[in-house]
Amino acid sequence: MKDSQSKIHPGSGRRKALEFNKGRQSDDQSIDDLKNLIPNEYFRQRDMLIESLHLIQDHYKCLKPKHLTALSELTNLPLTEIYETASFYAHFDIYKEDDISPPETTIRVCDGITCEMNGCKTLEKNLSDSVSSNVRVVRAPCMGRCHQAPVVEVGKKHFVNADVSVVQKALEEQDTKPVIPNYISYDDYVKNGGYKILNDCIENKKDPMKLIEEMEQSGLRGLGGAGFPTGRKWRFVRAENKPRLMAINGDEGEPGTFKDHHYLTRDPHRFLEGMLIAAWVVEATDVYIYMRDEYPDVIKFLKKEIKILEEKNLNIKTRIHFRRGAGAYICGEESSMLESLEGKRGLPRHKPPFPSQVGLFGRPTLIHNVETVFWVREILEKGAVWFSSHGLNGRKGLRTFSVSGRVKNPGVKLAPAGITIKQLIDEYCGGIQEGHTFKAYLPGGASGGILPAKLDNIPLDFDTLQELSLIHISEPTRQVP
């Protein structure tokens, strides 16, 4: 057969195929750029696409067609699929090839509700007017530090109660790296009984079914919003066929919510132990931690602490994988998070089947948020009765509230389930600020609606807001002026 005939497409009659590939072509330099930047194994793993995009964004400050095309060739994924994935997430800046790349430093001004109340628009304008041309100023969604508004991120470092002078000083000193908090270290955690229960599990000194019963009796429910009973969820997942997986939803993206960040930056090993205990109970071979990219401090030190666990063989039963979110609000929804963990756009899945049946990579998956597993060790140490004995107005357990707005003492408040907003403000927050009147509050984030002050006696807990057609998210309570 002649060469010209060999290029004829089947079924295309006498039309000849093009003697070159259609579409954008990769260049050798861009291929080399990515090979030097991205671990080789990422190119063979579909679920590492978003992390690969992160590495390009981190290094070049944007995504340009030449690198997306090179990534397509290296991963053997269609360029359209890579572009659709990248364009879905707010933290990826897609530029045209001939566009000037963004400045080395980006200032992000939080425009969340509490930051709006504390003058973020004026702050953004003043910063835009005062910084040099090699710095860009953009608005960004809630950064999870609402009790210290307004918040500004310079590079990867967050400044709370920010003003122009603070930001200018950071620019002058190139103070743009995240601050690692003074959290409880592995050694200090172990000195206070940490990982004893997990070690007992690893050595088969614990009965997984008894641990499930203890969690069921405690009444602990999923604290990411859905409120599904934790012990029952463990039982359901354990009953499914192996292999099973676990996923942690650390994408604390509901505006006004910052409780997970609070716990992680103070006692990360309590979270990690609870996570590994839950994984052991359901016999999960792997656990995937999905952490929001807005928490660079947590991302940095949590990776370090996970390495310590690996050195101590505390993950001998369960491999730990760490993934970054990319600024998609919808990925707080569990099935959207699973799609994102698989390296795809975070589009919600139809249910059923539920993740406990068909979850990550099609396997039965136990999904918890950060705070839920944070309570596991304490409940197993002190007993189910200890946890369930707390509560007001007929409710059981403890709840963590992210309180911000016009209160004297905003912040994370641990209170009995069923407390009312009036009690929470008066007894835990020191009351309303001078010169302000309590007018309304958001009991469950931006998706949960606004309640007027006259409804200040409603118990704040699961199932208490449904008759008002409100959604309970995760206790991000704010006062509206």
Residue positions per predicted region:
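Gly-rich Lys/Arg/Thr-decorated short loops/hinges at beta-loop-alpha junctions or inter-strand turns
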Residues: 189-196, 248-260, 355-358, 402-407
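Conserved phosphate/anionic-ligand binding catalytic regions in large, soluble enzymes, centered on
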Residues: 216-235, 327-339
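Local cysteine-cluster metal-coordination motifs and their immediate loop/turn environment
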Residues: 51-54, 81-91, 101-122, 138-157, ...
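Iron-sulfur (Fe-S) cluster-binding modules
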Residues: 1-65, 69-74, 79-84, 88, ...
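Single conserved hydrophobic/aromatic residue that forms the stacking wall/gate
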Residues: 471-481
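Terminal amphipathic helices with adjacent charged low-complexity linkers/tails
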Residues: 291-299, 304, 436-440, 445-460
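Histidine-anchored nucleotide/phosphate-binding helix
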Residues: 89, 267-281
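Hydrophobic alpha-helical positions that pack around
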Residues: 299-417, 429, 433
